[in-house]
């Protein structure tokens, strides 16, 4: 009886998957067959976490006349992706620490190492990102500071995997919060979300 029931359930599952696949084939049109689109934009950004919000801000500031659309699968009350639940800081290594950070990230991604050209670009961006972050923050009355309050504190940092070569380097950890506050829960993402809103960028949940 149990074997028969298990077989019946398996057949039902296979049937459901088959019907679902057939239904999908009926309503999903290959992109090369689409002649007319309901809407066209200059920049389409999928995901409204910190990366999506930052991309939207940068796209707008490069071309204020560009049509930008951000799509987020979650409801607006749960927007922010992983970014809103993270430690709420940016890692900003000193420019003198770029090679050390490259070594650390290289070791973090073994046995599938990141190409050196990309690592160089990424780490140079880490080390020079702070002025842009402060520019975005200032535009919505936010500021970058130490996560416990006060100004940024530069010095020796040890990141997550301290057993990896390159895990210790000079830099700071920058938290974003409303001006005058000491800490804001979700402040890093909320700052960029406010910057997106200020620019009138279309976000759909």
Task: Enumerate the predicted regions with their spans.
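Sec-dependent signal peptide cleavage junction
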Residues: 15-27
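Gly/Ala-rich phosphate-binding loop of Rossmann-like dinucleotide-binding domains
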Residues: 56, 60
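Beta1/beta-strand and adjacent pyrophosphate-binding region of the FAD-binding site
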Residues: 34-51, 69
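Positively charged n-region of N-terminal signal peptides that target proteins for export
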Residues: 1-9
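Conserved Rossmann-like nucleotide-cofactor binding loop
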Residues: 51, 55, 76
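Conserved redox-cofactor binding core of oxidoreductases
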Residues: 124-205
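Glycine-rich active-site loop/strand segments that organize a redox cofactor
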Residues: 87-124, 129
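Glycine-rich FAD pyrophosphate-binding loop
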Residues: 61-83
